[in-house]
From Swiss-Prot:
InterPro entries: AcCoA_carboxyl_beta, Acetyl_CoA_COase_Trfase_b_su, ClpP/crotonase-like_dom_sf, COA_CT_N, Znf-ACC. It comes from Pedobacter heparinus (strain ATCC 13125 / DSM 2366 / CIP 104194 / JCM 7457 / NBRC 12017 / NCIMB 9290 / NRRL B-14731 / HIM 762-3). Residues 1-23 are annotated as: Disordered. Its main location: cytoplasm. This is Acetyl-coenzyme A carboxylase carboxyl transferase subunit beta. It catalyses: N(6)-carboxybiotinyl-L-lysyl-[protein] + acetyl-CoA = N(6)-biotinyl-L-lysyl-[protein] + malonyl-CoA. One of its GO terms (cellular component) is acetyl-CoA carboxylase complex.
Amino acid sequence: MAWFKREKKGISTSTEEKKEAPDGLWNKCPNCKKALHSADLLENKYVCQYCNYHLRVGSKEYFQVLFDNNQFTELFPNLTSGDPLNFTDSKPYTERLIESMAKTGLKDAIRAAHGKIEGEDLVVACMDFNFIGGSMGSVVGEKIARSIDYSIKHKIPFLMISKSGGARMMEAAFSLMQMAKTSAKLALLSQAKIPYISLLTDPTTGGVTASYAMLGDINIAEPGSLIGFAGPRVIKETIKKDLPKGFQTAEFVLEHGFLDFIVDRRAMKAKLAAFLKMMKN
């Protein structure tokens, strides 16, 4: 004879009583794997409160972090890529563009805006890694070029936030042209004596590193960012040697003289405002 008898076979909850967490309410830190509430992430500028890992975010979040009261005027919002080469890999390039636009809500891998940081005017161009790996195509180059022209015309400092896997292979030479195009525009910005600040975030690689990302009057990076040209695996296979510990991290690049500062995202707005005030005076 059983000591206990279960009167009810199981516990059931009516559908009306069930409560589900809304999508996007919780995130997991890629570094320490701890759960992060979206409200805490927003308050902490998308930096893990446990291990200080800087989560990858896009232009929407950077504009939110940097611009006063999240107020800004978006510049050149309707530029979209063509397909002059009729490129097809696993799928047609035009189809890939349409899918990326639907998935991200973006027109391409960059957005540009004019706003204020602690009262100081600033033009910001920010790349989005979620759009085809933040790859640099003709629209990315054109938006940067037009943003620089806008900065020169209105005499406003320019901030470039890079986050990219490099040149967009689907546009071939049209993509590579953007390296020279943006570098030439930055030379005009320098001639006009207008400050250019380059912020390198995780990851900044390929043709972006080899052009505008490293040409700032001040080059800044976020902690732990991957910064380089070719990837570490490709380099290791080429030179047949083990790479130094921490190779291609922001800290390694700073130590070897290619960066001026590493700045925590939570202090970024104040640091940028200080630079702007210093350069204006």
